[in-house]
């Protein structure tokens, strides 16, 4: 009863034209046809491809993951290019980027960005570096001692870093990110309990 009111919003984002073209290509592929006939043996792999595609096409190994996808590439598109982030190729990332820019320009808020995929966190990290947005990152590769130091720095209200990148697997019990008053769950986990654990990192005792 001592916590502020929590507002949850589900934001629906349109696929970019490139995402939509790749999505339809995959649905028409022989692999999906086999799955629909009950002959396919890798339904989880297919779902994983669609989940990554909905985050950003750069998370896929193109054209290997989607045969024939090279015919759909926008002019100048280079799969695997790690020097920049093509924000416009992802509906979700386009919305998120505008949201982060608004927070940076108009508020003193801090935000936690959560994803199941370290590849997506890599994408966020490149975006932050290119936009010169201060951030911290915590994933499963970081040891316990460094984690707490990172959390303490982020929770310091005078710290200039306003973004905290967090893998959902690392966002379990005991992690207290009350320095943030906003959180974006970029993609859901298979287990809803994992999502709830991650969401609880912000809305907890000490939150203003």
What would you call each of these model-derived segments?
Residues 191-208:
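Conserved SF2 helicase motif VI
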Residues 175-188:
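A short beta-strand element within the Helicase C-terminal
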Residues 2-19, 27, 37-163, 167-171:
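Conserved Helicase C-terminal RecA-like lobe
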Residues 170, 189-190:
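Flexible, active-site-proximal loop/turn residues at the rims of small-molecule/cofactor binding pockets
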């Amino acid at each position: 009863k001592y916590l502020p009111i929590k507002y949850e919003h589900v934001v629906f984002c349109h696929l970019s034209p490139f995402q939509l073209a790749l999505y339809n290509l995959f649905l028409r592929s022989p692999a999906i046809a086999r799955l629909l006939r009950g002959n396919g043996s890798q339904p989880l792999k297919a779902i994983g491809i669609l989940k990554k595609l909905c985050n950003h096409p750069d998370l896929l190994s193109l054209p290997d993951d989607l045969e024939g996808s090279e015919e759909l590439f926008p002019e100048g598109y280079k799969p695997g290019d790690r020097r920049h982030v093509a924000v416009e190729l992802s509906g979700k990332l386009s919305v998120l980027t505008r949201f982060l820019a608004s927070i940076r320009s108009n508020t003193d808020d801090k935000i936690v960005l959560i994803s199941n995929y370290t590849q997506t966190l890599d994408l966020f990290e490149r975006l932050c570096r290119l936009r010169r947005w201060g951030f911290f990152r915590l994933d499963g590769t970081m040891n316990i001692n460094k984690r707490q130091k990172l959390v303490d720095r982020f929770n310091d209200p005078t710290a200039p870093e306003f973004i905290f990148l967090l893998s959902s697997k690392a966002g379990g019990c005991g992690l207290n990110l009350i320095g943030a008053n906003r959180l974006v769950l970029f993609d859901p986990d298979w287990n809803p309990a994992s999502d709830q654990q991650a969401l609880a990192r912000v809305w907890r005792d000490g939150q203003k």
